[in-house]
């Protein structure tokens, strides 16, 4: 009888990536098949996020529901991973004894052994260590699920912003070898992937080893990824302003595969608050980066993160944030009311901004950015946009839908063979959350660049260094 696995994922795109790898790994080692119904599962996994307030309480609330399932089926295995698991460790089992497996973001590759341990000994296992890059060497080959794919290039963060738990839950920055990344992307391209999104907590800090012992910078990696035949669109997230160097900006100038859209978190427009956050840059320095980016790529759109109501934030601080929003003309944002995270320096600061004031400020900021986004959408009417067709439209199954470089959904009339390919459309109308387009040309009529085939990358000879890290050599 087929064993079934249910995974509940909370949090960022990195968590989504990790969960997909867990599913592939356990399918290859134990034959687990995914199910959306927890009651059907033989194994329940919760991949957690600790960025937002009350993350732990959400975890224990769901575990309370899963406990009832385990009472009905004592053979059911329950595992908790991700950042809350990394933070809580053994304490998590003290509050929820029904949990059998506790693993951190860097130890998900050990899940098969942990599950075998539970099945063989009927005793729990906890592994929240930080074994650096080992996780990537033990995960199964990538599997494409449509024309877009996420690829993790690094883990962790060294910045220790005062509000953030990432360095404590995912560890410090560790970069994957560049050849491993290119090999994975070439495999995905061979399966029909056309767009890759490079993932990391701080991708522009990437410094990966090459097969000849050199170091590959993030700018170099972007060019190498863009050169793989079949990969015609490259994205990345997330970046830190202090490492957004000129060589990365130069890639925007000469590499058309890199999209005209950038998510660059700033958090606040107030230099005083930025200092308290330990962001290590000013609002003016942030704007200087954006100015240079727009010189290199005039049509680039910018999104960002904002924390509203950070301890000590005054009305003047908030007004400076709103000035930055207008000056940069952000297209979209992930904006939240500040919530203290246990163990971070900011958690010890007096939170002297009222909840009502925080909510009001957040509403003002989100309303302004929504207004700017609509203005940008209206400016796209009459322009020609290249979109990657992802499938049928959610609004009309007789139509297709795809995304522009700046992440707008475009609905248009087309034929099924266009799915997974690029088309050029003219934007003719704007709606609240999408655009309307008219087909102008298909991929067969485009002059897409070809540099290196996926097969030529895959054909490289694999060698392993003394640490067992795979290297690929021509």
Curated annotation (Swiss-Prot):
Function field: Catalyzes the methylthiolation of N6-(dimethylallyl)adenosine (i(6)A), leading to the formation of 2-methylthio-N6-(dimethylallyl)adenosine (ms(2)i(6)A) at position 37 in tRNAs that read codons beginning with uridine.
Record-listed E.C. numbers: 2.8.4.3
GO cellular component, one term: cytosol
Protein name in UniProt: tRNA-2-methylthio-N(6)-dimethylallyladenosine synthase
UniProt gene name: miaB
Family: Belongs to the methylthiotransferase family. MiaB subfamily.
Record bears the keyword Heme: no
Record's cofactor remark: Binds 2 [4Fe-4S] clusters. One cluster is coordinated with 3 cysteines and an exchangeable S-adenosyl-L-methionine.
Annotated residues for binding of [4Fe-4S] cluster 1: 12, 49, 83
Intracellular or extracellular location(s): Cytoplasm
HAMAP family with a match to the protein in the record: tRNA_metthiotr_MiaB (MF_01864)
Matches recorded under InterPro entries: Elp3/MiaA/NifB-like_rSAM, Methylthiotransferase, Methylthiotransferase_CS, Methylthiotransferase_N, Methylthiotransferase_N_sf, MiaB_methiolase, rSAM, rSAM_horseshoe
Entry keyword set: 4Fe-4S, Cytoplasm, Iron, Iron-sulfur, Metal-binding, S-adenosyl-L-methionine, Transferase, tRNA processing
Reactions accelerated catalytically: N(6)-dimethylallyladenosine(37) in tRNA + (sulfur carrier)-SH + AH2 + 2 S-adenosyl-L-methionine = 2-methylsulfanyl-N(6)-dimethylallyladenosine(37) in tRNA + (sulfur carrier)-H + 5'-deoxyadenosine + L-methionine + A + S-adenosyl-L-homocysteine + 2 H(+)
């Amino acid at each position: 009888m087929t064993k079934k696995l249910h995974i509940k994922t909370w949090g960022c795109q990195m968590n989504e990536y990790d969960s997909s790898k867990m599913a592939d790994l356990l399918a290859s080692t134990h034959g687990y098949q995914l199910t959306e119904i927890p009651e059907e599962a033989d194994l329940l996994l919760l991949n957690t996020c600790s960025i937002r307030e009350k993350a732990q309480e959400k975890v224990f609330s769901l575990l309370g529901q899963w406990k009832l399932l385990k009472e009905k089926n004592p053979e059911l295995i329950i595992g908790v991973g991700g950042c809350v698991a990394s933070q809580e460790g053994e304490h998590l089992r003290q509050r929820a004894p029904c949990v059998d497996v506790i693993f951190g973001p860097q130890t998900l590759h050990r899940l098969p052994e942990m599950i075998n341990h539970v099945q063989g000994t009927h005793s729990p296992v906890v592994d929240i260590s930080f074994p650096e890059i080992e996780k990537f060497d033990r995960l199964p080959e990538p599997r494409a699920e449509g024309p877009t794919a996420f690829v993790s290039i690094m883990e962790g963060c060294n910045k220790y912003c005062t509000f953030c738990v990432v360095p404590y839950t995912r560890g410090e920055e560790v970069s994957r070898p560049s050849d491993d990344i290119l090999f994975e992307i070439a495999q995905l391209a061979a399966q029909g992937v056309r767009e890759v999104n490079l993932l990391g907590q701080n991708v522009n800090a990437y410094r990966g080893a090459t097969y000849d012992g050199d170091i590959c910078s993030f700018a170099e990696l972007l060019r190498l990824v863009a050169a793989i035949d079949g990969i015609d669109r490259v994205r990345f997230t997330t970046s830190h302003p202090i490492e957004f160097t000129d060589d990365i900006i130069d890639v925007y100038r000469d590499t058309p595969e890199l999209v005209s859209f950038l998510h660059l978190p700033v958090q606040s427009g107030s230099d005083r608050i930025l200092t308290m956050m330990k962001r290590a840059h000013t609002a003016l320095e942030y704007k200087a980066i954006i100015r240079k980016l727009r010189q290199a790529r005039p049509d680039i759109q910018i999104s960002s993160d904002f924390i509203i109501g950070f301890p000590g934030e005054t009305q003047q601080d908030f007004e400076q944030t709103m000035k930055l929003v207008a000056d940069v003309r952000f297209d979209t944002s992930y904006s939240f009311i500040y919530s203290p995270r246990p163990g971070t320096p900011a958690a010890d600061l007096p939170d002297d901004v009222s909840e009502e004031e925080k909510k009001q400020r957040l509403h003002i900021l989100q309303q302004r950015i929504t207004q700017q986004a609509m203005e940008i959408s209206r400016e796209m009417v009459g322009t020609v946009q290249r979109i990657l067709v992802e499938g049928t439209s959610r609004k009309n199954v007789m139509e297709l839908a795809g995304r522009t470089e700046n992440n707008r959904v475009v609905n248009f009339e087309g034929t099924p063979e266009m799915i997974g390919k690029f088309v050029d459309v003219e934007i003719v109308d704007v709606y609240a959350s999408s655009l309307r387009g008219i087909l102008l040309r298909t991929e067969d009529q485009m002059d897409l660049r070809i540099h290196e085939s996926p097969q030529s990358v895959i054909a490289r000879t694999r060698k392993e260094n003394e640490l067992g890290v795979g290297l690929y050599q021509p």
